[in-house]
Structure formats: C-alpha cells, structure tokens
Amino acid sequence: IRDSLNELLNRGHKVTAIVRDLAKVTASNPNLKVVQADVTDTDVLIEASKGKDAVISAYNPGWKNPNIYEETLKNYPLIVDSVKKAGVERLLIVGGAGTLFYAPGKMVMDADDVPAKLLPGIKSLGEFYLNTLRKENDIDWIFLSPAANMTPGERTGKFRIGKDDLVVDVNGDSNISVEDYAVAMVDELEQKKHLSLIHI
C-alpha cells in the first residue's frame, strides 16, 4: 500500500487511505486523509468512499494469518458491495499472479512449485477473482495481477502489460518491483485503458 500511496500523492491526487493499523501510513501530505477501519466495518468503508472517483483495494488478511483463505473469500465481497453502495463506479484491485497461465491450461496457483505457506492466500484471491469478481457487472473493475515475483526495487516506469498469461523475460523469469507495480496501478487509474483483468 505504501508505494501506491506515494505514487498517488506524488502525482497530486487527493487520497483517503483506509487502514487497520495507522502505523502503516507514515506519509504526511495535505492531500492525504487517513481513516482507521477494518474491512468488516462496512459503514465506515461506504462513508469514506462516497464522492470518490475510484477505490483501490490492497486488502490482504495477512500472509501469516492462519485464516487467510476464509477471510479473503468472506471479506473481498464486502469491499465490492461497499464500493457499490458508496456510488463509486471504479474499483481497482491489487491482484495476484495465481490466475495467470504459465503454460497452456495451467495456472500459476496450480503449479507444483508454489510454496505451501503461500498457497491459501494465492488460491483464495484467485478463487475470488474467478468465481465472484468476473461476474460483477454493476461497476467497472480492474484486477491488476503482478508478475510472479514482486519485490522492493526501483521505480523505472518500464514494464510490459499482458492479459491472461504470465509475462516473463528472455530467461523465463517473471519479476516486477513494487514501485513499478504502483506506477502501473496509478497509470490505469488515470488513463482507464483497460477493463477487467490485466497484469504486468
């Protein structure tokens, strides 16, 4: 969330950040308002979202949360519903690479080399996208899937955009920095080039 927030503020956007832990937001900016709430506090989500041009969701119950699978599938529909009730027309979601194809008919989340400790989080977000989000027709939504590996690095502004297949380099590796992912997310917010799934 930090990199996307910084990218938004650096481009002059007015942002309301909704976070569980206020300590997660260290930025100080006149265009930033911080609201403390849990994703299940739907009344707060709705009120904070009213009048906004778009909502960007980076919700994750926590990779170490033993209930990440159940909470992702339970809570993400609450976010979608809150956005609709707030009257916001666009929802951009920090997606996962799990539903991308690394080979014909084979999704990343079904690969044998996915670490077991990450599988519940990867599968739950993938299932939310496949079984729930793709059926959503009342708002414009984007599920922005990152590369298979997303790590802190540099903001280069250089990346490739794909659709259903994992984007890899000449060596077959799939990487992007969190900084460049934030650039892609805010670019999409501003330019409205795509509908539904895109990935970088």
Where are these regions (language model features)?
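N-terminal Rossmann NAD(P)H-binding glycine-rich loop of SDR-like oxidoreductase domains
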Residues: 1-11
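Conserved catalytic-site region of short-chain dehydrogenase/reductase
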Residues: 64, 98-103, 149-153
